[in-house]
Amino acid sequence: MKSVALCCRFPEVLIAALPLLLALPLSLALPVWADTESGSCTLRLSGGWVVDGSGEPGFQGDVLLDGERIVAAIDRADPRGTAWGNGLHCAHTRDVRGLVVAPGFINMLSWATESILLDPRALSDVAQGVTLEVMGEGRSMGPFVNPQRANLRASAIDAGVAPQWRTLGDYFGMLRQAGIGVNVASYVGATTIREYVMGRKTRGPNESELAKMRSLVRQAMEEGAMGVGSSLIYTPANYATTDELAALAAEAAQHGGGYISHLRSESQHLLDAVEELIEISERSGARAEIYHLKAAGNANWSKLNQVIDAITTARSRGLEISANMYPYTAAASGLDAAMPPWVQLGGVDLWVERLKDPQVRQKVVAQMRDPHPDWENLLLDGADKARLLGVKTKALRRYVGMTLAEIAAARGVSPEDAAIDLVIADRSKTRIAYSVMSEANLRKKLQLEWVSIGSDASAPAAEGRFLYQSQHPRAYGSFARVLGRYVRDEAVLELEDAVYQITGLPAANLGLTDRGRIAPGYFADLAVFDAGKIIDTSTFAESHSYAKGVQHVYVNGKPVIADGKPTGALPGQIVRGPGWKGSVQTAISQR
């Protein structure tokens, strides 16, 4: 795949340099691939195939680093550049002949919020070449009031984490102080904001509540948030109105941020949900992105073409609309995505208590079987398409890896009753993989120039307490799968296009001007991999399995993977959005 938009990009560095070049005699013009103000070089990556993240063709050459920044990317076919580079002494040289040198990969949908506190190396992602985790799908790690902190603590203590922070800025500060192996960015969660102001109310906000919500978005933007993220199929987020979301997105846009959303529907009402996102972008002035773009359920697969048409039309009108995806046909969520929202109101305790009532249970079962529900039901394609990934309760671990149909048969109950039993016994911690997408649609999405990649997973290690829970393979394999299966093995897209879609594209969508490219002055976030060997190895049966083929990964110029092995280094930084005002004094009440 080589669309006009992908093949004809003019490098931004060259564009910026044109006035200078045109003003100088040809003999005095400076090479655009070099930071001429830098007089030192700490590392030379020598002889690799450089794919710079722009979508332009790669070249054999050298990438020179000075500490945490890139000094130059030199094409060996350019005698002048080679001569300049050879004249610059580098303290260290690493021979990377036969390997691809690319910008570090950007995970546009990361749930490493808690796993990075347990193990700051983020190895499942780093082993694939990921150098930036972008969090905040609906829920973010602040701002919190005490009830929210208590709920998070109840959940997180199961994973060995006791949250002490209140704001997103506090969370950033804690990560920075503790040390992290990858860079971290985050949107502020629209659900988190809503619960802070309104609790779990099922109505839209009044004028004063909306003003408070906007002020919290403003504070989060000043703390470094990338914008506002929503997840509209889950309670209580599903009660957010379009007006409410547009107002929050507008506040983010005033600070240079964007809006990103798990759509209100990915199945029966998919087209309406896409139009809502486009409307929010148009009304707010915010660029907008769709989380894990999909047409879920066999009956809805044909809708993807209409979605693509709608987004293409919106983009032609000047709106900045994009999407991300993961390269698997199975989604993953909880059993809350298989039950009507009303039964979940008020949180886990009330949800469980309601399900224990025989009359409520009967009503829930009937609605779970309704082929045309007015809510998003990921079980519509059948219990044989829903596989148990993980539970908290030890007594239930014997079911991990089984489908809901198999669990129901083993327990002698219906699949709907089995799901209800799991929620009651595990108190909603149950994780399910739902096979709801088509391979043909997956390939079609990969070829769209405005689609990037997000794992929609945490970043565990294949060791310790992480082994108690199975994982969706996307946690260990999303990026390697794109480069191995869909680029090398099946030629669905070209290497330069794929690298652009996991580096330069998401960086541009985030408004980053110094990451996502191999260019002078950019941060030295780099992935060095063997294009002939890179591949995902994680499966549903053996999920804790690292990807293969990545030899070296640099985060801010420091190696976190060297010769295919983790170094233990923690050089990650907080990547803050354009509204950041440095050290922000918290204005959040301590209630």
Task: Give, region by region, the residue ranges found by the protein language model.
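Bacterial N-terminal signal peptides
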Residues: 11-31
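Histidine-rich, glycine-flanked metal-binding segment
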Residues: 35-44, 50-104, 119
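Divalent metal-coordination and catalytic microenvironments
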Residues: 48, 68, 98, 109, ...
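Acidic, glycine-enriched loop/beta-strand segments at the rims
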Residues: 50-62, 430-436, 441-442, 490-499, ...
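Metal-associated gating/positioning segment near the N- to mid-region
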Residues: 93-163
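Active-site neighborhoods of metal-dependent hydrolases
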Residues: 172-175, 180-207, 211-234, 249, ...
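Divalent metal-binding pocket/active-site signature
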Residues: 219-276
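C-terminal cap of metal-dependent C-N hydrolases
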Residues: 357, 444-451, 456, 527-573
